[in-house]
């Protein structure tokens, strides 16, 4: 299984390494200390996360509380703009929250009026119209703090995946799954996180064999790259894509850029060594 490395910028932008389209050749790159380094290929940002529920004050810019985020016309327009600025991949952060759904679920109540199109359907249809690819979320079973140690939470995410596969598995915009198992990579990824990811992945392979599967763990700022278990845990994962959160803009690390390039190099070496 080939795992591609993605980088998330400011928690919601995705550097999509699987895009072989437009690339820019740079004549020189500037290092963090201001000196010029060897020429490097620049990959454009070609994907973004979509955040439907307003969860707390951290969403005030990406998802203003005063907007109706369930309005299908809003998302039709947004997706068109995303395509215009070069987005090819859309990732649902979640399609349910606090046991209400943003799609026509039979498992829970709807978070939008039943007389109009769901926001998930609006986004999927607009994405198909513009030739874009969508990663469908399997959360939240409850909320953004879903604990996959809880069998009920993991079971509900699998139920949601089954329902979503039935609704969107054959949709022309459906490309894969985003598993919201956002566990911490520091110091190493936990056993329970690996097991939860692989359990969800196994079900996803049964439902949609050709779909790509992505996770987005956090915490590389305090990862113990020298611990042999760090590499071993990555090798155990059965996903296709790891979208590492660089956490720029977060409060976990005051100056994340100072170590970011070095961290990416270490991760690249680990992935090359394991061959995944």
What are these regions (language model features)?
Residues 1-5:
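Positively charged n-region of N-terminal signal peptides that target proteins for export
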Residues 6-11:
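Sec-dependent N-terminal signal peptides
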Residues 15-17:
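C-terminal motif of bacterial Sec signal peptides marking the signal peptidase cleavage site
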Residues 19-21:
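Bacterial signal peptide processing site
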Residues 30-276:
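Glycan-processing catalytic domains of CAZymes
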């Amino acid at each position: 299984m080939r795992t591609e490395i993605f980088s998330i910028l400011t928690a919601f932008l995705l550097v999509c390494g699987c895009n072989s389209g437009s690339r820019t050749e740079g004549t020189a790159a500037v290092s963090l200390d201001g000196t010029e380094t060897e020429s490097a290929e620049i990959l454009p940002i070609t994907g973004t996360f979509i955040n439907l529920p307003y969860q707390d004050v951290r969403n005030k810019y990406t998802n203003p509380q005063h907007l109706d985020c369930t309005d299908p016309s809003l998302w039709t327009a947004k997706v068109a703009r995303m395509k215009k600025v070069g987005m090819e991949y859309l990732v649902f952060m979640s399609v349910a929250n606090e046991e209400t759904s943003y799609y026509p679920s039979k498992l829970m109540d709807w978070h939008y009026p039943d007389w109009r199109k769901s926001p998930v359907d609006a986004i999927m249809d607009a994405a198909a119209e513009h030739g874009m690819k969508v990663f469908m979320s399997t959360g939240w079973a409850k909320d953004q703090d879903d604990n996959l140690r809880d069998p009920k939470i993991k079971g509900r995410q699998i139920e949601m995946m089954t329902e979503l596969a039935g609704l969107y598995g054959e949709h022309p915009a459906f490309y894969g799954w985003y598993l919201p198992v956002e566990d911490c990579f520091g110091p190493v990824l936990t056993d329970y996180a690996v097991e939860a990811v692989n359990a969800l992945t196994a079900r996803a392979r049964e439902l949609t064999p050709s779909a790509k599967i992505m996770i987005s763990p956090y915490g590389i700022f305090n990862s113990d790259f020298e611990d042999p278990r760090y590499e071993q845990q990555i090798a155990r994962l059965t996903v296709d894509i790891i979208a590492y959160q660089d956490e720029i803009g977060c409060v976990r690390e005051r100056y994340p850029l100072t170590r970011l390039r070095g961290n990416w190099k270490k991760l690249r070496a680990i992935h090359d060594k394991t061959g995944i």
